[in-house]
Swiss-Prot record:
Annotated PANTHER family: PSEUDOURIDYLATE SYNTHASE, TRNA PSEUDOURIDINE SYNTHASE-LIKE 1
This protein's name: tRNA pseudouridine synthase A
SUPFAM superfamilies assigned: Pseudouridine synthase
Keyword tRNA processing: yes
Binding annotation for substrate: 111
Gene name of this polypeptide: truA
UniProt cross-references to Pfam families, sorted A to Z: PseudoU_synth_1
Known role: Formation of pseudouridine at positions 38, 39 and 40 in the anticodon stem and loop of transfer RNAs.
Family stated for the protein in its record: Belongs to the tRNA pseudouridine synthase TruA family.
Keywords on record: Isomerase, tRNA processing
Amino acid sequence: MPRYALRIEYDGGPFAGWQRQAAQASVQGAIETALGRLELGPHTIAAAGRTDTGVHATGQVAHCDLAREWDPFRLAGALNAHLKPLPVAIVAAARVSEEFHARFSAVERRYLFRLLARRAPEVHDRGRVWRVPHPLDAEAMRAGAAHLVGRHDFTTFRAAGCQAASPIKTLDALTLETVEGANGTEYRFHLRARSFLHNQVRSIVGTLERVGAGAWTPDQVREALDARDRAACGPVCPPQGLYLTGVGYPADPFA
């Protein structure tokens, strides 16, 4: 059966996450339903990252096996037609080898978290950023973030119910970009690693927000990391500011 890689964009707001749910809308379920309108199923697709409820994606990657050969451009267009009016889009499709696996072939995942500091409620970015009503110290947050880059035991920064076999991960990059606007300052956290633990990004950003607000010192981030205790973590920030922006492979399937 020919295998296809799909690059996917979605607004996570209306969905109970990526993974198929028995009684709730999911991104996986929406795409599998669209595939079923192209070819008789059942269809099961696998993704590089199983995003949680409310988490968005601009560069999710999944793969599917189909019964016949499709022109990748036409496949993407046909799926998009059947996905309407849901906020899900197949940005690109590519024919790949049977050895390609969206999850297990991935060597890098990239996330963005958008944090907006302003007193007034967000309007145009509602559901797409985490808003806090107080100013933040970007340099303090960068200093705190520096403690987390590299290979560490991230027990403190993973969900209590995380099912990963090991809490040890290598965070390859964690950078902070500030965007000054007329109506507030947006802080954009960019994170890159081969893989992440459940709630790792939201735990890190929630903790760094406390540093930016002055409630924590940058060195307390290191102390929390060294504690290897979930109770030492700062607040876990809400999901709506989180985006899966890209997945890396040894060879780009969409090139």
